[in-house]
Amino acid sequence: MTAYKPYRHQLRRSLFASTIFPVFLVIIIGLVSFYAIYIWIEHRTIHQHVDESQSSLHHTEKQIQTFITQHNNSFQELDLTNHHDVTATKRGLLKLIHQQPATLYYELSGPNQFITNNYEHLNTKNMYLFSTHQLKFKNSTYMLKIYMANTPRLSEIKKDSRQFALIVDQYDNILYANDDRFTIGEKYRPQQFGFMNESVKLNHADHRLIIYKDIHENIEDGITLLIVMAVVLVLLVIFGFISADNMAKRQTKDIETIIQKIYYAKNRHLGTYTPLKNNSELEEINNYIYDLFESNEQLIHSIEHTERRLRDIQLKEIERQFQPHFLFNTMQTIQYLITLSPKLAQTVVQQLSQMLRYSLRTNSHTVELNEELNYIEQYVAIQNIRFDDMIKLHIESSEEARHQTIGKMMLQPLIENAIKHGRDTESLDITIRLTLARQNLHVLVCDNGIGMSSSRLQYVRQSLNNDVFDTKHLGLNHLHNKAMIQYGSHARLHIFSKRNQGTLICYKIPLSRGNVDV
């Protein structure tokens, strides 16, 4: 029988795949989409911040340039050796610085003069040199340097968006940075992974403003999110597997019940009708199984009954074919004895009546071996009357063997065959030996008659396999066919014979079925 995988397992896998895999795909697609949207938003934000910062710095630069242009003539009338003019110059520059949103420091240097608003003496090397201008004063020409320490917009971008600003020259030397990871004066080397940046030109000196974002921090947050989602996914997998298994059990319970009923029906142990727990179209199959089982049982019982009747008919037919020639000969003997010896004729009639009563008994096809032997003794006694006591019957049997049950008329044909075909001498000795071995009764019938030639022996052996109704030789053929009907192929009959040396018939009868009325 082919081994099948339970349908419940296949359904469980299908349910599991149809629930967990879509969730897994949704999570993956969601993560990829989230990452793509995040990158897009960050790029857009950086672009916006670059534009805003560029505009703010250009506005500051324009205001400074406008201030210097407007006050250029005024500066030429001031003498920075004069204390009053120095104060006026400081006041004007401070006004310019305070009007700008950026944190600016100026340095005005000339011959023996240095003016600045860097009262805290901050290191201007860490500041961006925003612009330089030459200013002509009355006493001399001075150099004005304006440094940018920070701008509110860049600080706001750094605080709110974690985006940092760099200003580099045309050789990528860092001129300004509000991130401690970069040092002013070093080369700017953009990272290949984990950074997003955008740059824009600031001035004619090819200085560039770079706004960049370090996404490693977000990646760490993303990893944490991934771990959380992985845990959730594992829990979903476990929950999905348990749910799929329970659902598969519920959905296939009726199918498994039907399969079990089919198995019981094959072994003829189905029992009475029981409906399925769930009212579904499977109930049609359930009803059909019971209807088919009942029809099959009725058919089996009908076949068994027909076979029993056929065996009974065959057995009766065989038993009837044993009788005619014997009855005819016996009746002639009785007719002869009535005149010569009425008393002996009466004895023969009594023996014949007992034999007929035995052979015509219809309530059972099995008898004790002892009854069969009594029948044989009566049969031989009648035959001895016909043949002047020339037949000597010897029975060798244990008491246990005599009480075994065998089919009726299973031994008589052997004696009949010995008398019919072995009688050609003044005396015919027939020996019946009965032994028990391995649940079998072994019967040996030996006579000292004329025996058979090799060709005749071969013919008799072959005739045993002919159909009982197709042969004219009824003796051993009838017995063999009767044994095959009653005991099956377990019964064995072997014939051995030599010309003028007698005949030996070995017969094995299974006792395991002997007690059954077949």
From Swiss-Prot:
Its EC number is 2.7.13.3. The chain crosses the membrane at residues 20-40, 222-242. Autophosphorylated. InterPro entries: Bact_2-comp_sensor_kinase, HATPase_C_sf, Sig_transdc_His_kin_internal. Residues 297-513 form the Histidine kinase domain. The modification Phosphohistidine is found at H325. Keywords: ATP-binding, Cell membrane, Kinase, Membrane, Nucleotide-binding, Phosphoprotein, Transferase, Transmembrane, Transmembrane helix, Two-component regulatory system. One of its GO terms (molecular function) is ATP binding. Its main location: membrane. It is found in: Cell membrane. It is a multi-pass membrane protein. It comes from the Bacteria. The keyword Transport does not apply. Pfam families: HATPase_c, His_kinase. One of its GO terms (cellular component) is plasma membrane. It catalyses: ATP + protein L-histidine = ADP + protein N-phospho-L-histidine. Member of the two-component regulatory system HptS/HptR that regulates genes involved in hexose phosphate transport system in response to changes in extracellular phosphate sources. May act as a sensor protein kinase which is autophosphorylated at a histidine residue and transfers its phosphate group to the conserved aspartic acid residue in the regulatory domain of HptS. In turn, HptS antagonizes CcpA-dependent transcription of a subset of CcpA-regulated genes involved in antibiotic susceptibility. This is Sensor protein kinase HptS. The gene is hptS.
